[in-house]
């Protein structure tokens, strides 16, 4: 049980995929202008990341490894992720058309979010079991969502602040992301 808690804490706070591993930077910068959009994207990514992590584990463990097709891992994982994203897109479209319209092009772009593929590949590399894979995917997704929503709320405040002209736009966003990364470094001592 302690091992499971450590997986969650380490992926959410200590080894955050955005701020430490630099995965998922495209949606991190692209969808973080408004908290509502960031929250929707975070929820969709959480669902996709967790489900694709589990599905990728199953495909690798019961299809690729027994047949000796490990060299097809990346392509197989991309196909699994694309299928999960399509499923998520259909669910969001049916349950929340407003969120579907707000997310726009970013929802299908979850397919190309390198954090999703990174989690699937790191699960294999670290030889996680089924539960560990699910928790690793969930922790990475919660960490991604947490950072995305925090960053969006900071960007909303910075948008109305008196920022010097050379720092407006992406410059202040990157500085803010760097400061957030420094803040998350304070969690390094939690997990050894």
Swiss-Prot record:
Q: What is its EC number?
A: 7.-.-.-
The family annotation for this protein states:
Belongs to the NqrDE/RnfAE family.
The reply on keyword Translocase is yes
- Write down what this protein is called: Ion-translocating oxidoreductase complex subunit A
Key words of the record: Cell inner membrane, Cell membrane, Electron transport, Membrane, Translocase, Transmembrane, Transmembrane helix, Transport
The UniProt transmembrane annotation reads 5-25, 39-59, 65-85, 102-122, 134-154, 171-191
What main location does UniProt list?
membrane
What's one GO-annotated cellular component?
plasma membrane
User: What gene does the UniProt entry assign to this protein?
Assistant: rnfA
Species name = Thioalkalivibrio sulfidiphilus (strain HL-EbGR7)
- Superkingdom as given in the UniProt entry: Bacteria
| Role description | Part of a membrane-bound complex that couples electron transfer with translocation of ions across the membrane.
Give the quaternary structure: The complex is composed of six subunits: RnfA, RnfB, RnfC, RnfD, RnfE and RnfG.
Q: What class of enzyme is it?
A: translocase
Its GO biological process annotations read: electron transport chain
State its location(s): Cell inner membrane
InterPro entries per record: Ion_transpt_RnfA/RsxA (IPR011293), NqrDE/RnfAE (IPR003667), NqrDE/RnfAE_oxidrdctase (IPR050133)
Give the record's membrane topology: Multi-pass membrane protein
Give the PANTHER family listed for this entry: INTEGRAL MEMBRANE PROTEIN OF SOXR-REDUCING COMPLEX, ION-TRANSLOCATING OXIDOREDUCTASE COMPLEX SUBUNIT A
């Amino acid at each position: 049980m302690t091992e499971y808690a450590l997986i969650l804490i380490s992926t959410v706070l200590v080894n955050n995929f955005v701020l430490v591993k630099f995965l998922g930077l495209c949606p991190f910068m692209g969808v973080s202008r408004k908290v509502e959009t960031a929250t929707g994207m975070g929820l969709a990514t959480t669902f996709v990341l967790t489900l694709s992590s589990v599905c990728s584990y199953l495909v690798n463990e019961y299809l690729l490894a027994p047949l000796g097709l490990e060299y097809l891992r990346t392509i197989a994982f991309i196909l699994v992720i694309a299928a999960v994203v399509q499923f998520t897109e259909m669910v969001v479209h049916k349950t929340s058309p407003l969120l579907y319209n707000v997310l726009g092009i970013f929802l299908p772009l979850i397919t190309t979010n390198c954090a999703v593929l990174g989690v699937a590949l790191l699960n294999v590399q670290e030889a996680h079991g089924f539960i560990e894979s699910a928790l690793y995917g969930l922790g990475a997704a919660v960490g991604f969502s947490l950072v995305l929503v925090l960053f969006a709320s900071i960007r909303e405040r910075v948008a109305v602040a008196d920022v010097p002209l050379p720092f407006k736009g992406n410059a202040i966003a990157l500085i803010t992301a760097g400061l957030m990364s420094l803040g998350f470094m304070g969690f390094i001592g939690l997990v050894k």
